[in-house]
Amino acid sequence: MSKQYEAAGVSLTAGYESVSRMKKHVARSMRKEVMTGLGSFGAMFDLSQLNLKEPVLVSGTDGVGTKLKLAFALDQHDTIGIDCVAMCVNDIIVQGAEPLYFLDYIALGKAIPAKIERIVAGVAEGCVQSGCTLIGGETAEMPGMYADGEYDIAGFAVGAVEKQKLITGEHVQPGDVILGLASSGVHSNGFSLVRKIVAESGLRYEDELMMFGSTIGNTLLMPTRIYVEAVKAALETEKIQAMVHITGGGFYENVPRVLPEGCGATFDPKKWPTLPVFDWLEQAGNVPRHDMYNVFNMGIGYMMIVKPEDVAAVSARLARENETVYTIGTVTSEPGVRILGVDQ
């Protein structure tokens, strides 16, 4: 059976070797609440050990989009798993949920154990950074479905929060202050546009740009920041009204998701430093300024909304985590998002 299966393009041997290689990486992320080992039909997590009186589970799923194309082009697969974890855990921490466990799904045309190990090592690193465990996953070898050397990756995160401590944004009011935490770069959104700009520029991912201090490829592949530890610290103040993870849709689409009806937001781009990568993308691609804020994070990957009198306390707590906080905007009584110097 295995010989016939292998002749059809599926290698059970490669699959077994891949699992064996990833075990040491998965072990790095283990939490004490995990009740099953790698390979169980279902992964089990003992929620009772969290000692939550009214636990609410919060879940999120995502992938990394066409950023994968850069990983393929450069044969760099060590950090793409961090991106996958980040996209999920940064979403669920928005509502105050501590990430507990993560499952990944990797689909590819041909199983190459060494490559799969590199991908999963990145996933495990993302889990370590966010304090959750890589509790399970699936690696699917599907011949004929993907081009040689290509794959897709997606993930699913589950977190928990005490019901009374859910962050819902329902008490946000005009006059509240919006704090911003820096991004590491483009993160994992907008890469279809990024790839188009690079292709039309005549440059290669291997080319170095002085303004980047690195190659174009390395700058663009910089993994998405995981904000879990910083957010958990800020939540200790019990002063957070709402939070925003800036992903696809940039400022214009993501900020309104957490604002009550009748509220909007105004941002002043002069209040935080612009990353060189966004300056280059805007200039090289001749991208309108409004579109930049509608596609990219523009240097701010995460936002927190607080009362004016709580800015100092929240900023001080984040500073203890070596986090630089920018006061980037305010909540307004005019619905929608307005960016000074962009929206007139």
UniProtKB/Swiss-Prot annotation:
Biological process terms in GO annotation: 'de novo' IMP biosynthetic process; adenine biosynthetic process
Transmembrane regions listed in the UniProt entry: none
MF term (GO), any: phosphoribosylformylglycinamidine cyclo-ligase activity
Pathway of action: Purine metabolism; IMP biosynthesis via de novo pathway; 5-amino-1-(5-phospho-D-ribosyl)imidazole from N(2)-formyl-N(1)-(5-phospho-D-ribosyl)glycinamide: step 2/2
Keywords per UniProt: ATP-binding, Cytoplasm, Ligase, Nucleotide-binding, Purine biosynthesis
Enzyme Commission number(s): 6.3.3.1
Organism domain of life: Bacteria
A cellular component term, taken from the record's GO annotations: cytosol
Subcellular location: Cytoplasm
Catalytic activity: 2-formamido-N(1)-(5-O-phospho-beta-D-ribosyl)acetamidine + ATP = 5-amino-1-(5-phospho-beta-D-ribosyl)imidazole + ADP + phosphate + H(+)
InterPro entries found in the cross-reference section: PurM-like_C_dom (IPR010918), PurM-like_C_sf (IPR036676), PurM-like_N (IPR016188), PurM-like_N_sf (IPR036921), PurM_cligase (IPR004733)
NCBIfam families per UniProt: purM
Family from the record: Belongs to the AIR synthase family.
Protein's UniProt name: Phosphoribosylformylglycinamidine cyclo-ligase
Species of origin: Exiguobacterium sibiricum (strain DSM 17290 / CCUG 55495 / CIP 109462 / JCM 13490 / 255-15)
